[in-house]
């Protein structure tokens, strides 16, 4: 730093009594060329000697706005300072709204109580003429049902008697067919004829049993077998015997035809054919008995 001293006829400098360290009227500033904050020249006009002293720069200061609210410069600064940035006060913090729990769902409304059950109305008594009409309808229905049951029993009795007679005739004809023809042949030598003879015996015995049971039922109103099992037994046995008759007659017919083709026609195969024809008729009668027993089994008033 360069310091310059200059003697002038000015009063000697004096210090402020308040102790602020500033020079009073005995100091003067130099022109604008030496007015920088870095180089300051102080001239002393003391008559004894010129003294040079370094004066530190002042801190930057800011004055209040002279005319607030009217616009303008917004205040002035000292010569040796720059404009300081204005620090705006921090914005107030935004308060977060308090989190409130969601409202509880409303409770479901209680269902209304069920209405009281009203007593059922008393049944109306039918008029007297309706009772008379219902009685007139029931009695004929019962009588017709009894007549129908009696007719079915008579038909079943006749069918049993016919089946027993036919089976007896068939087995008698075939049993007499021994030592017949030019070969003196017998039915016992052929399995088909023996099978037909056995089935005719079974059919005859079963038909006799059914005939006796039906006669006892019609006379005393009592059957040898209880009612629920009786109809099922009759239906099953009629089906079985009818199947045996048709199968034995078919096999015996095939055997008799074979004998006629091989050895010619004579009395032996002719009697066998007669017995087979009677067995076929017995099968038809057993089929009718099966229909009657099925009606008795599946009728409504069982």
Swiss-Prot record:
The record's Gene Ontology cellular component field reads: plasma membrane
Q: From which organism does this entry originate? A: Zea mays (Maize)
Q: Which residue ranges traverse the bilayer?
A: 155-175, 198-218, 239-256, 274-294
Q: How does it sit in the membrane?
A: Multi-pass membrane protein
> Annotated region Disordered: where?
1-134
Q: According to its UniProt record, where is this protein mainly located?
A: membrane
InterPro entries, alphabetically? CASP_dom
Enumerate composition-biased segments (Low complexity).
40-60
Q: Which family does it belong to?
A: Belongs to the Casparian strip membrane proteins (CASP) family.
Tell me if Aminoacyl-tRNA synthetase is a UniProt keyword of this record.
no
Q: Where in the cell is it found?
A: Cell membrane
For bias kind Polar residues, which ranges apply? Answer: 1-13
The protein depicted here goes by the name: CASP-like protein 4A2
- Residue ranges annotated as compositionally biased, kind Pro residues, are 99-129
């Amino acid at each position: 730093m360069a310091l310059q001293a200059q003697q002038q006829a000015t009063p000697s400098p004096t210090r402020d009594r308040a102790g602020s360290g500033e020079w009073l009227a005995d100091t003067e500033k130099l022109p604008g060329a030496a007015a920088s904050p870095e180089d300051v020249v102080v001239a002393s006009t003391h008559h004894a000697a010129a003294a040079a002293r370094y004066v530190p720069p002042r801190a930057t200061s800011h004055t209040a706005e002279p005319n607030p609210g009217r616009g303008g410069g917004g205040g002035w600064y000292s010569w040796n300072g720059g404009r300081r940035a204005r620090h705006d006060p921090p914005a107030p913090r935004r308060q977060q709204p308090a989190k409130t729990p969601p409202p509880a769902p409303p409770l479901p409304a209680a269902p209304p109580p069920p209405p009281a059950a009203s007593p059922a109305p008393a049944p109306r008594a039918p008029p007297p003429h309706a009772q008379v009409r219902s009685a007139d309808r029931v009695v004929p229905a019962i009588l017709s049902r009894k007549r129908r049951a009696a007719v079915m029993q008579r038909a079943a009795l006749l069918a049993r008697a016919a089946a027993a007679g036919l089976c007896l005739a068939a087995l008698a004809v075939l049993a007499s067919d021994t030592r017949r023809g030019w070969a003196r042949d017998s039915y016992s030598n052929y399995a088909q004829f023996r099978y037909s003879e056995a089935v005719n015996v079974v059919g005859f015995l079963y038909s006799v049993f059914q005939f006796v049971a039906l006669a006892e039922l019609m006379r005393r109103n009592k059957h040898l077998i209880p009612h629920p099992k009786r109809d099922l037994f009759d239906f099953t046995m009629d089906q079985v015997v009818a199947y045996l008759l048709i199968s034995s007659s078919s096999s015996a017919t095939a055997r008799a035809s074979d004998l006629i083709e091989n050895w010619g026609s004579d009395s032996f195969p002719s009697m066998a054919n007669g017995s087979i024809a009677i067995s076929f008729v017995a099968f038809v009668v057993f089929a009718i008995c099966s229909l009657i027993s099925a009606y008795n089994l599946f009728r409504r008033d069982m």
